[in-house]
């Protein structure tokens, strides 16, 4: 009885591995959830709304300091593949200062990047997050299950 039992366990384990030999991913990029066809356009449209919102307010807020040319790069979220719950979202930015060295004539550049984590509530479903960010002013919308916005998260980051 024991040899059959262990053979069954080996067969079950083999069946749980994808055919290409890789283990199934626990987390996936939100752009490809639930499938690339279903997630890609929707997520990129939300990202474009966020970038427009940032560009609209940058001159009066974040872009008043040393890094007056801040640019939003990418907004990315990781999603638990089995449940659709967001694990984390990060929005990346870049900015620079360029000055002339008066003694040497060289251009001195201080270029930086920032990775700003979104202040999400635990276990936020991706579908609810995207629906929230598709409405009105995405940058100022309260994130699901919180009383904070992406703008609030940027205040502590940039």
Regions found by a protein language model. Give the residues of each.
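Short N-proximal segments of mature Sec-exported proteins
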Residues: 71-101, 106-114
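N-terminal signal peptide c-region/cleavage motif recognized by signal peptidases
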Residues: 16-18
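Flexible, solvent-exposed short loops/turns enriched in glycine
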Residues: 100, 106-135
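C-terminal partner/receptor-binding element of secreted or periplasmic proteins
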Residues: 121-158
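N-terminal secretory signal peptides
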Residues: 21-88
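Sec-dependent signal peptide recognition
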Residues: 2-10
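Cleavable N-terminal signal peptides
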Residues: 10-11, 21
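Intrinsic-disorder-associated interaction segments
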Residues: 32-39, 43, 47, 119-122, ...
């Amino acid at each position: 009885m024991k040899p059959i039992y262990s053979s069954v366990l080996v067969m079950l384990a083999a069946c749980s591995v994808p055919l290409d030999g890789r283990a199934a991913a626990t987390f996936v990029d939100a752009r490809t959830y639930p499938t690339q066809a279903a997630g890609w356009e929707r997520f990129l449209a939300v990202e474009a709304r966020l970038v427009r919102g940032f560009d609209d307010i940058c001159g009066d807020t974040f872009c008043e300091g040393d890094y007056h040319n801040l640019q939003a790069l990418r907004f990315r979220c990781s999603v638990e593949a089995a449940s659709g719950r967001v694990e984390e979202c990060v929005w990346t930015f870049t900015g620079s200062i360029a000055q002339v060295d008066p003694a040497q004539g060289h251009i001195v550049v201080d270029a930086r990047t920032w990775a700003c984590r979104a202040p999400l509530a635990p276990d936020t479903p991706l579908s609810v997050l995207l629906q929230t960010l598709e409405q009105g002013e995405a940058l100022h919308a309260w994130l699901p299950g919180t009383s904070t916005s992406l703008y609030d998260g940027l205040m502590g980051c940039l």
